[in-house]
């Protein structure tokens, strides 16, 4: 596995020198300063590439080239946004960057309710609390029909939870959900958020798949032509939320993608922390079935709680994900490729780490503090070595 590290650009509190000292050789980054939908010019790509290479590293993966909401809703200037996306892929290929992670989650990217969940050892993790999310949706956002997505017990618990929240609790929960987490290219006010949700009122799973198919059929041939590998990131969490459909959550969704556009440029990011939230997702089976199309991996674990829709981010080798078997399956896929004469290692990055030790005193991007990821990278590296990497 190629050891990589996500870096949010020059404003990231974690420097490229830190990344190199952590033992990573590749960088996962994006041009976050370019508005959604606009073309990434060769000039801007080369600027970022030079910064990375001057630090003794390589730009291994783009995460992400964001998809404009008009494409997801199939409205407005979606054709122009698709054309821009095609050009960005051509420009990336021209600059020698050929692995692109992206997602097709509507409105929100990855979502958490608590960004400072204190673990028994005093370190902090990210958490998704199903009851707090229900309290937000029903009592703060006041989304019409939200009650239909929850059990009677969850509705009652959410009402009690909301009643105990201070104004600051409500404001913090709202910020955590809609203000945009690291890597998300959109942040919203509450009113803006309601308006964006309204755009999806007539879009169910079938319709969102239809819109995704339009995107794939336009993008994948260009990626194939220029030698770019597209690696879709799963939904996080991998289930419908806020009345929004999710279409990259299960092995069945993966098969749908392959059936829709059967090109080797149409591939996957194996994010164990996203897929692994669902108990019915067999991650090892996913890797074995779609291994040749896995072009990027995010390795972390989550722990489901008493309410199985509530989870927190566990240590990399703990939690509900059997990381040894996952890494072993990835290494076996790399060996298969080598036997066929291919030399393409699968880039791996230690996904969200715990905020711990000296990082507890620092301002960090949620999930992306240095020391927790350093620990995770070392643990996953050792797991890879032990499994035959």
UniProtKB/Swiss-Prot annotation:
GO terms for biological process: D-glucuronate catabolic process. Belongs to the mannonate dehydratase family. It comes from Escherichia coli (strain ATCC 8739 / DSM 1576 / NBRC 3972 / NCIMB 8545 / WDCM 00012 / Crooks). This is Mannonate dehydratase. It is an enzyme of class 4 (lyase). Pathway: Carbohydrate metabolism; pentose and glucuronate interconversion. Its EC number is 4.2.1.8. Catalyzes the dehydration of D-mannonate. Its cofactor is Fe(2+); Mn(2+). Keywords: Iron, Lyase, Manganese. The lineage of its organism: Bacteria, Pseudomonadati, Pseudomonadota, Gammaproteobacteria, Enterobacterales.
């Amino acid at each position: 596995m190629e050891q990589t590290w996500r870096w949010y650009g020059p404003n990231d509190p974690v420097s490229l020198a830190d990344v190199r000292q952590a033992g990573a050789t590749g960088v996962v980054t994006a041009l976050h300063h370019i508005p959604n939908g606009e073309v990434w010019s060769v000039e801007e790509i080369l600027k970022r590439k030079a910064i990375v290479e001057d630090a003794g590293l390589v730009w291994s993966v783009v995460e992400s080239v964001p998809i404009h909401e008009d494409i997801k809703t199939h409205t407005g200037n979606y054709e122009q946004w698709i054309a821009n996306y095609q050009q960005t892929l051509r420009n990336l290929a021209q600059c020698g960057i050929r692995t692109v992670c992206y997602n097709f989650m509507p409105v929100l990217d990855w979502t958490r309710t608590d960004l400072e969940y204190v673990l028994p050892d005093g370190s902090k993790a990210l958490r998704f609390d199903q009851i707090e999310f229900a309290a937000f949706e029903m009592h703060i956002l006041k989304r019409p029909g939200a009650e239909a997505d929850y059990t009677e017990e969850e509705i009652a618990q959410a009402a009690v939870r909301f009643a105990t929240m201070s104004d600051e609790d409500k404001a913090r929960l709202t910020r955590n959900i809609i203000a945009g987490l690291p890597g998300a290219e959109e942040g919203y006010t509450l009113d803006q958020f309601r308006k964006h949700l309204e755009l999806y009122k007539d879009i169910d799973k079938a319709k969102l798949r239809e819109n995704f198919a339009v995107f794939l059929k336009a993008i994948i041939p260009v990626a194939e032509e220029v030698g770019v590998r597209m690696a879709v990131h799963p939904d996080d969490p991998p289930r419908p939320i806020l009345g929004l459909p999710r279409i990259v959550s299960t092995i069945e969704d993966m098969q749908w993608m392959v059936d829709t556009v059967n090109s080797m440029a149409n591939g996957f990011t194996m994010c164990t922390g996203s897929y692994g939230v669902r108990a019915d997702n067999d991650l090892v089976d996913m890797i074995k079935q779609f291994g040749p199309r896995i072009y990027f991996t995010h390795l972390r674990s989550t722990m489901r709680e008493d309410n199985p829709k509530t989870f927190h981010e566990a240590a990399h080798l703990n939690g509900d994900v059997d990381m040894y078997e996952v890494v072993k399956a990835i290494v076996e896929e790399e060996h298969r490729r080598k036997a066929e004469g291919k030399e393409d290692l699968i880039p791996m990055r230690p996904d969200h780490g715990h905020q711990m030790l000296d990082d507890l005193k620092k301002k960090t991007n949620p999930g992306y503090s240095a020391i927790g990821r350093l620990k995770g990278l070392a643990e996953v590296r050792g797991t890879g070595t032990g499994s035959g990497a």
